[in-house]
Structure formats: C-alpha cells, structure tokens
Amino acid sequence: VTLQKFSSWTDLMDALNSGKIDGASVLVELAMGAVSNGIDLKAAALGHKDRNVVIVSDDISDVRDLKGKTFAIPSNQSSHNILLNDMLALGDLSIDDINVVQLAPSEMPSSLASGSIDGYCVAEPFGAQAVVQGYGHVLYDSTDLWQDSICCALVFNGGFLDKNKEAADEFLSTYKEAGSLLDEGIAKEVAEKYLGQDEKTLDVSLEWIHYDDLDISLDDYEQLSEKVKEYGINDNPPSYNDFIYQ
C-alpha cells in the first residue's frame, strides 16, 4: 500500500472520486455527498470510535457562553458540524447565534491560543493538544452529545472494488484486525511517526480514542443519515446498502 498525504479535503476527494487514488480516510459526510451526486464510492469501515471533543477558551464554561462567538469546524460536511448543532440545541441556541468558520484541524489549537476563535470541534490529536498546552478545555465529548457517532471512514473508489475485490477484502480484514489488536503503546509509536505531536499530547489523546469495532452498523448509519438531513448537510443521503461496502 502506498500512502499519499493531501493538504485539503477538496484535493483528497477529487483524487478519490476520479480514481486517482483507490481509497482514503475521509470525513464520511463528504463521501456521502459524493455518492448523492452520482460518484461510485463505498464506505468500508470506521476510522475510529467516538471521542471528537469540543474545545473552548477558558472564559467559556457553558454552551450559552458561545453566543456571538467564533467557532471552528473542519468542514460544513462533517460530523463536527452535527455535534456543534446538537450542542447548541442544549443551550437553546442555533447555528445563527454564532460565527462558524472552517479551519484545517492542525490550525485550530493555535487559532484558539491567538484568540481568533473561541472554540472548535475536531478529531484527535488536536483536541488534546490545546488541553495539554493550556489553550483551552473540553466543554463536551462527542459521547455526551451523540453516542456511537460516525466521523471518519475508510472509503474505496467503486472502480477499484470492481476490479480488486479480493485484495480489498484482504486489506479490510487486516485493517479491522489491526484496530482490535491496537493498544496504547503500539498506537503511540505509530502516532509519533506520523502526527508530529509531543508525548504528553499523544498520551492524553490515546486515553480518549479507541479503534476496536470499526464496523459501520445499520443503526449508527441510519442515525447519521437522519442528522445530515436535519441539519441541511445532505437532503438525500445514500442508503446503507448503496453506500456501505459489504
């Protein structure tokens, strides 16, 4: 397997949709949107389970304190957008009550530290980074807002699957097995190699996140589908059978 890094979701999705790459770890809503627009993609497994966090500056102690503030998410088509909407509802707020900006996850901790944003929702390790470095604190964990939430997924181009089903099945089996066997020590070694974070940040991050049971269940996907419709992210999400590789 050859790994290729992309600097933006747009570039990654263009490569995946066109078949320039065979598969990717991607925000699941982006892949759902592509399928709704006629692109042949299949989601095969989760990237991780739960534990996206809402990080806010120290002057914010309640969701209602976010009114009029600036909040960052990685993409409008993301579970982080869903979690933001779910959280705002707890304080009788709506998305119109705050200023939402899209930022690359790696830019979120420094933006919070500089005061250009007041909070963000993101996957690891960028939540732990702000906590460890003293830029902010956790207001909500995704499990508080949406149990068994789906965020990133391993997604294959349909053309690749048509021609390489046996190889894809072998890869997927090994991928899921790796998740079930992964302990914090091994995960930390891999994270140190690729993520460029300090040891304390990785220790905190790996306490929050887990990789066992990476199957995409029907119940969890149907809940996701309802939420993307509710919040205007995708009015016509693909069905489980059309989108989930089985």
Name what the model sees in each region.
Residues 28-30, 101, 105-190:
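Pocket-lining segment of extracytoplasmic ligand-binding domains
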Residues 162-235:
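Secondary-structure end/capping motifs
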Residues 35, 89, 131, 192-193, ...:
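Short polybasic/polar patches that bind polyanions
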Residues 10, 14, 18, 32, ...:
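Solvent-exposed, polar/charged alpha-helical surfaces in well-ordered, non-transmembrane soluble domains
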Residues 230, 236-246:
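Hinge/cleft segment of the Venus flytrap/periplasmic-binding protein
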